[in-house]
Regions:
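A short beta-turn/loop motif at secondary-structure boundaries
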Residues: 74-76, 165-167
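Catalytic core of non-heme Fe(II) oxygenases with the double-stranded beta-helix
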Residues: 83-152, 162, 169, 179-192
Length: 196
């Protein structure tokens, strides 16, 4: 038997140590309530963190070029960036990111067992319990979330981070992107030029 992976979902991983200055910048951000945790009131925090922004932009570009391989001159721009704060007993609710193409999360501070869960919303009508879960039969899949880890994913992919079970507040930086440049194809009547 041969099995082919048709339309796989790319999840990108990049690592970079957070600097003391960057961490202090994040810790001093004003916060507001969110569903299950708190988030920064500033939703463009990467504007104040040039080196980290450059790392994230380079990672997003590599991910985009490697997975989409666009024919025309198009790139992704970061539209919003904010910090999430989950104290012990708090969580980050299940959600996706509308009005964005690729989203990402960079972990600033974590506990040993922190994870991010991704979900697929197909097969809700019929469920088959499995003896061994894998990429084909799972409704969700998780990856470790640790300090300095950047995870990129399609913005439409539902995800969440469970309740903090350790003693440390989990802090992450999230962001959205949107294409700038030529999208679609003029001769196919799908062409669109998006400019800032």
């Amino acid at each position: 038997m041969n099995i082919h992976n048709l339309f796989p979902t790319p999840i990108g991983f990049f690592d970079r140590a957070i600097t003391d200055e960057e961490k202090l910048f994040i810790l001093n951000l004003e916060q507001r309530p969110n569903l299950g945790n708190t988030t920064s009131t500033n939703n463009k925090i990467l504007n104040g963190m040039t080196a980290l922004r450059s790392f994230i932009e380079e990672s997003v570009n590599l991910y985009f070029q490697s997975t989409v391989r666009p024919k025309h001159d198009v790139s992704l721009r970061i539209t919003q960036s904010w910090a999430n704060f989950s104290s012990p007993g708090q969580h980050h609710h299940k959600h996706a990111h509308p009005n964005s193409y690729i989203s990402g999360v960079y972990y600033i501070q974590t506990n040993p067992n922190d994870r991010i869960y991704f979900y697929r919303d197909e097969w809700k009508q019929i469920k088959f319990p499995s003896e061994n879960y894998n990429e084909y039969n799972s409704e969700s899949w998780w990856f470790e979330a640790f300090e300095g880890r950047l995870i990129l994913f399609p913005s439409s992919l539902t995800h969440m981070v469970p309740t903090v079970e350790g003693d440390t507040t989990r802090i992450s930086l999230s962001f959205n992107t949107f294409p700038v440049g030529v999208v679609g194809e003029e001769v196919e009547l799908t062409g669109l030029r998006l400019e800032v």
